[in-house]
């Protein structure tokens, strides 16, 4: 969707979609370094399906670089995957619904009532708009766990020759 809106070739958007679908498949092996596990698993699956090696390599690069601990937006496909993955925060992702027992990650996600990634192709601006219930989680807790993700989004937007903005509860913060 990000690449489509910015006018990238349809095939690039399709490859980003495939990479997005496969980016966390390595979690079946381990949460640690799952980006690399996911990339290797994607290579095996896509190669067996007959995908061109150059396209497999693009997907591997996107999948292997989506984690904030070690990833970098190395091309437009990886940039799109990073933006989609790192902006995916919403209460529907939380399994435990008992707020007092939630860790900070679940509390922040549960507090996110709305999350929307807007791509303004004309202005070359990508904006993540969030509505956070501050009765559940103060905005500062969002930054405690998401600052590195937002930094990664800014780098990804830059690869796409865009500016990245973050709006929380109507206030533009980045």
Predicted regions: what they are:
Residues 1-2:
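Amphipathic alpha-helices of TPR/Sel1-like and other helical repeat/solenoid scaffolds
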Residues 6-119:
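Divalent metal-dependent catalytic cores for phosphoryl transfer on phosphate-bearing substrates
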Residues 88-174:
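Terminal helices and disordered tails flanking the catalytic cores of nucleotide-processing hydrolases
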């Amino acid at each position: 969707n990000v690449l489509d809106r910015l006018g990238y070739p349809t095939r690039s958007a399709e490859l980003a979609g495939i990479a997005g679908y496969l980016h966390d498949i390595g979690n079946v092996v381990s949460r640690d370094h799952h980006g690399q596990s996911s990339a290797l698993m994607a290579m095996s699956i896509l190669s067996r399906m007959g995908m061109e090696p150059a396209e497999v390599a693009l997907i591997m690069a996107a999948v292997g670089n989506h984690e904030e601990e070690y990833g970098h937006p190395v091309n437009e496909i990886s940039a799109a995957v990073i933006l989609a993955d790192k902006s995916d925060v919403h209460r529907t992702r939380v399994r435990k619904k008992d707020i007092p027992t939630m860790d900070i990650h679940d509390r922040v996600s549960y507090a996110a009532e709305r999350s929307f990634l807007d791509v303004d192709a004309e202005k070359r601006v990508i904006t993540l708009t969030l509505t956070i219930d501050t009765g559940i989680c103060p905005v500062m807790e969002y930054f405690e766990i998401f600052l590195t993700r937002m930094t990664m989004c800014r780098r990804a937007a830059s690869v796409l020759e865009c500016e990245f903005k973050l709006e929380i509860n109507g206030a533009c913060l980045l």
